[in-house]
């Protein structure tokens, strides 16, 4: 019951966070729609959600696997959208 309550709270926090889009719980990219990947939750790597690929100016992870990736992603960030690359911008990496 405690685990269920934690998951509900996690989903609510993510749903109402600025810029977060939840399209569904997943295990692999193949379970997500076009333009999304199955990324690990920022709170627990055991929970994954279908989230949009990175757009211009959005934060990214330089080692993120291309889409579709058959394994389980460890990052909470998807790769950049088609035509964009993940490059260092100041202290962060951003899609550009």
Curated annotation (Swiss-Prot):
The keyword Membrane appears for this protein: no
Keywords for the protein's UniProt record, in alphabetical order: Disulfide bond, G-protein coupled receptor impairing toxin, Secreted, Signal, Toxin
Compartment list: Secreted
Bridged cysteine pairs (disulfide): 26-38, 32-50, 37-78, 60-86, 80-95
Gene Ontology MF terms in the entry: toxin activity
Pfam families linked to this entry: Prokineticin
Lineage top rank: taxon: Eukaryota
Tissue specificity field: Expressed by the skin glands.
Protein name: Prokineticin Bm8-c
Position of the signal peptide: 1-19
UniProt record similarity statement: Belongs to the AVIT (prokineticin) family.
InterPro entries: Prokineticin, Prokineticin_domain
Source organism of this protein record: Bombina maxima
Transport is among the record's keywords: no
GO CC list: extracellular region
Chief location category: secreted
Biological role: Potent agonist for both PKR1/PROKR1 and PKR2/PROKR2, and inducer of a potent and long-lasting hyperalgesia. Also potentiates capsaicin-induced TRPV1 current, when tested on DRG neurons. At subnanomolar concentrations, this protein both induces potent chemotaxis of macrophages and stimulates LPS-induced production of the pro-inflammatory cytokines IL-1 and IL-12. In vivo, potently stimulates the contraction of the guinea-pig gastrointestinal (GI) smooth muscle (nanomolar concentration).
GO biological process assignments: endothelial cell proliferation
């Amino acid at each position: 019951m405690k685990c269920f309550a934690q998951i509900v709270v996690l989903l609510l926090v993510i749903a109402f966070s600025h810029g977060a889009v939840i399209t569904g719980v997943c295990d692999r990219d193949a379970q997500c729609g076009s333009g999304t990947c199955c990324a690990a939750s920022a709170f627990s790597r055991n929970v994954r959600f279908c989230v949009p690929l990175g757009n211009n100016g959005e934060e990214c992870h330089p080692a993120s696997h291309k889409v579709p990736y058959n394994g389980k992603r460890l990052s909470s960030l998807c790769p950049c959208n088609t035509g964009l690359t993940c490059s260092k911008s100041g202290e962060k990496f951003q899609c550009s």
